Structure formats: C-alpha cells, structure tokens
Curated annotation (Swiss-Prot):
The active site is at residue 205. This is Purine nucleoside phosphorylase DeoD-type 1. Phosphate binds at residues 21, 25, 44, 88-91. The gene is deoD1. Its EC number is 2.4.2.1. A purine D-ribonucleoside binds at residues 5, 180-182, 204-205.
Length: 238
C-alpha cells in the first residue's frame, strides 16, 4: 500500500531500483533505456517508473538531495515495497587531478561528515560499504563496454556549500574518488534493513579546476553510468 512519500502498491516496483537524485533524470532513464514503462508514483513530483531492460524488470525513482531525503525513499522502498537492491546513479565532484569531468566512479565505500550512521549504530563508527557483488558486477559491466571506471571511497557531505574548502585537500590526500551527498546514508539504510546498495556516479564538476557540466547535461546525459548500472543488474542475476 502507499506510504507517506510513495503512492504506489506492492508489486509496482521491481526488486532492483535505480535511484538518481533528480526525478527528471529518473524520467530520462526510464524513457531512454527501459521498455514497457509505467509510471508508478509521483508524490512531490518524485517520479518512479517500472519497465524492462532486455526483458528484466527494473524500476527507477528519484531520491532527492542529501542523506535525509534519500534515506526516506530508500527505507520505504525496502520496507513497504519489497525492494532488495538499490543502485544510486548520480553525479559527484572530483578533488583528485587523476579524475576528470565525466569519468565514472564506483563507491566501494563512503565517508561522511553526517552523524546519521552513528545515530543508527549507537554512536559507534560504522564502515559504510557497498555490497561486494554489486561492486564487482558494476566493474565487470564497465569492462565489457570498454569504459574506464575508478573504484574507491566517496565522501557524502552534509553541506553542498561548505564553509571549509580546505577539507577538499584532505579528501584528495586520502584518495576520495568523488564528493556527493547520499552514499554513506544509503549504505547505512541497506545494512539496517538487510538490503544491498551501490553508488555509481559520474563526475559532473571538478572542485579543484572549476570545470563543470550544465544542469541540462546532468539531467539528460551520463549514459555510460546508466548502462553500467543496468548491465550490472543482469550480471547479478547469473
């Protein structure tokens, strides 16, 4: 039955959901890559769709910006709609010179300045990591398409406009492959509810050089990331 934030019914969603932050990107993914698409929810214009990719039922739904928004949608999808795997397909910023705009990065783990996982883990450090098989399948899917990917730690920031830009130098030193706002929270939700999760991101801007993509590009391109995510789902079924 419908939840406060998702007006769908049990069975409307596939067991695997791709989740971009932007609901317009969710619509783009559904219309571009899926067949037999049905819109299944639209509360607060956070669109959700279900269709098939090469015959495999897959859903896609936006999650908004930041850990709180992402956690709400992901929790309801898992608890109330039977979703087993969530793949974030979003954008991130780069801090390392070896990572360029439009590169694809896979979040094997996620650091954060949020306290959300300490709240759920009785104030202890929780190692927020992706599901290993999902990481492996995403890397294999990328290799099969000849797409170079970077695998490593993301940093999930609470603030988009940080008051301490020197933190980016520390992230670079520690080998952070991308800065975004959700992965650490979604890995915590997955662990709490016994689901599996992975964040795949395309670098939309470089924090050090200032190079960036446009909002239109972020909403309607980044196709390599989508194909990696979709192909990885098929590999996970084997």
């Amino acid at each position: 039955m419908a939840t406060p934030h998702i007006n769908a019914e049990m069975g409307d969603f596939a067991d695997v959901v791709l989740m971009p932050g932007d609901p317009i990107r969710a619509k783009y993914i559904a219309e571009t890559f899926l067949d037999d698409v049905v819109q299944v929810c639209d509360v607060r214009n956070m669109y959700g769709f279900t269709g098939t990719y090469k015959g495999r039922k897959i859903s896609v739904m936006g999650h908004g910006m930041g850990i709180p928004s992402c956690s709400i949608y992901m929790t309801e999808l898992i608890k109330d709609f039977g979703v087993k795997k969530v793949i974030r397909v979003g954008s991130c910023g780069a801090v390392n010179e070896g990572i360029k705009v439009r590169d694809v990065v896979i979040g094997m783990g996620a650091c954060t300045d949020s306290k959300v996982n300490r709240i759920r883990f009785k104030d202890h450090d929780f190692a927020a990591i992706a599901d290993y098989e999902m990481v492996r399948n995403a890397e294999l899917a990328a290799q099969a398409r000849g797409i170079d990917v970077k695998v490593g730690n993301l940093f999930s920031a609470e603030l988009f406009y940080t008051p301490d830009p020197s933190m980016f130098d520390l992230m670079d030193k520690y080998g952070i492959v991308g800065v975004e706002m959700e992965a650490a929270g979604m890995y915590g939700v997955a662990a709490e509810y016994g689901a599996k999760a992975l964040a795949i991101c395309t670098v939309s801007d470089h924090i050090k050089t200032g190079e960036q993509t446009t909002s239109d590009e972020r909403a309607t391109t980044f196709d390599e990331m989508m194909l990696i995510a979709l192909d990885s789902v098929l590999l996970g079924d084997k």
